[in-house]
Amino acid sequence: MSFDFIKDKNKHIHFIGIGGISMSGLAEILLYNNFSISGSDMNSSPITEKLKDKGAKIYIGHKKENVKDADLIVYTAAIASDNPEITKAKEKNIKLMDRADFLGNLMKGYKYNIAISGTHGKTTTTSMLSHVALKANVDPTILVGGNLDIINGNVRVGESDFFITEACEYKSSFLKFFPYIGVILNIDADHLDYYKDLDDIKNAFSKFIKLIPKDGYLVAYGEDKNIQSIIKEASCNVITYGINSGDIQAHNIEYDEKACGNFDVVKDNQKLFSVKLNVPGKHNILNSLASICIGLASNMKDKDIIEGIESFFGTHRRFELKGCKNNITVIDDYAHHPTEISATLDAAKKYPHNKLFCVFQPHTYSRTLTLFDDFTKCFDNADEIILADIYAAREKDTGIISSDMLGDKLRDRGLKCTNFHKFDDIKNYLIENTKDGDLILTVGAGDIYKVGEMYINL
C-alpha cells in the first residue's frame, strides 16, 4: 500500500464531518499510518472519542479557525458549500477533496480493491466478506459502513494489498473508485433526489462496471433484471450468482427456527460445499453467495470461505437482537427502502413470535415521496405497524409529504397502523399492547433504534 497522492506524511489533513461512519474510517487509516489528523463534527460521539484517543484533534462544531493549520481538507457530500470551514479553506487556497475522491485516491495504493455496490446489502456483504478474508489470513484493510465486532468497529488496517470497501452509488460516488473486483448486489430505484429515474441509476452502475480492469472480476446477482440489462458492458471476467441460475447457485435451501438458511453451494451442477448461515432471510443467502463468489475469485480455500460465512452473526443495526423484556423480543434493522423492509419483514415472519409489531421511521422526505407507492405495499407481513415522524437527515420539511400521509394510505389498505410523533408515546403504546411471545421490530436508518432501547431499559 502507498499514499502517494498525499506525498508528505508531515501534512495535516482535516476532515469536515469526521464523526460519519466512512469519514471516521478514513481518518483512522491515516492515523494508523502516522498522519497528523484533525476533524470537526456537530456532536461528540463514541466515534469522535475513539478518534481522539487515537491521536486526532477533534472540534465540536464547524468554525473557520478549525482549519487554520490544515494542508488538505476532506469533506462529505452532506457539507454545504457555505460551511465556514469550506469558506475559509477557499480563502486560504487550502486543497479540498470530497470523501469519494479521497477514498478513490487511497484505493490506488492497493492492488486488490474489492468494491461492493448495490442498492441494498452493502454493509452486510462487506462484513460477511471481511469474516471470510480474515479467516483466509489475507490481512485486508477493511472499510465498512457499520460496526463489526470482529474488527471492533468500522475499520481495520492491514498490511497486504487487499482493500475491502463499500461502494455507494449516491451522487455517483463509486465512479471515483478503482475496483479490481467490483460487486453489484442489486439495482433498485433509490436516491431519486439525485438520479432522474431508474434508467439513470442503471447508467451509473454501467459506468461502474467499466472501471473494472480486463483481468479483474465483476461479481453480480444474475437474477436481477436491472443487472441483466447492463452486464454486457463488462470487458472483465464475470461471475454471476443466484438461486435458480448463475455460475454459483444455492440449492437445497432450508431455514432453521430463526429463519437462517442452510444450503449447498453449486457450480456447474456440482456441489462445492454446504454452508449454514447465522443471519436470517433469503436476502442474506444472496449476500453470502456474493461473498462466496469473491472468495473463489480471490483463490481463497473452501474451508476458509465456509468458516468465514458461518462465523458471521451480523453487524450492528442489521437484524440486530437488542434484547428481551417479559418474553417479548426486540430486534432492530437499518432497512429504509421498501425492498429492504419487505426482506426484513419476510425474515421476521419466519422468526419465532406471536404478534409482529413493526415500528418504522421513514428516512428522508425525498425518499418517502418518490417511493411512496412502494412504501404502502411493503408492510403486509407485519401484524401491526407503528409509524414515527420522518427522519429528515440532510433535508428540510417542505410540507409536501409526511408520515401521517403514509399511515392514512396503509389504513386505507386495511392494515392496522398507528402514527405517533414522540418516541415516548410509541414506547408507552408498546408497553400497553404487547404480550408474551410478541416481536417488536424497529426499522429505519435514523434513530428509531432508541425506541427499542427505551422499551428494554424500562
Swiss-Prot record:
Keyword Cell division: yes
UniProt cross-references to Pfam families, sorted A to Z: Mur_ligase, Mur_ligase_C, Mur_ligase_M
Enzyme class: ligase
Keywords: ATP-binding, Cell cycle, Cell division, Cell shape, Cell wall biogenesis/degradation, Cytoplasm, Ligase, Nucleotide-binding, Peptidoglycan synthesis
Disulfide-bond pairs as recorded: none
Binding-site residues, ATP: 118-124
Location of the protein in the cell: Cytoplasm
One GO MF term attached to the UniProt entry: ATP binding
GO cellular component term, pick one: cytoplasm
Major localization class: cytoplasm
Catalytic reaction annotation: UDP-N-acetyl-alpha-D-muramate + L-alanine + ATP = UDP-N-acetyl-alpha-D-muramoyl-L-alanine + ADP + phosphate + H(+)
Keyword tRNA-binding: no
One BP annotation, GO: peptidoglycan biosynthetic process
InterPro entries on file: Mur-like_cat_sf, Mur_ligase_C, Mur_ligase_C_dom_sf, Mur_ligase_cen, Mur_ligase_N, MurCDEF_pg_biosynth, UDP-N-AcMur_Ala_ligase_MurC
The protein's Enzyme Commission number: 6.3.2.8
The protein's annotated pathway: Cell wall biogenesis; peptidoglycan biosynthesis
Primary role: Cell wall formation.
NCBIfam families, A to Z: murC
Family classification: Belongs to the MurCDEF family.
HAMAP family xrefs: MurC
Stated name of the protein: UDP-N-acetylmuramate--L-alanine ligase
Species name: Clostridium botulinum (strain Hall / ATCC 3502 / NCTC 13319 / Type A)
Gene name, Swiss-Prot/TrEMBL: murC
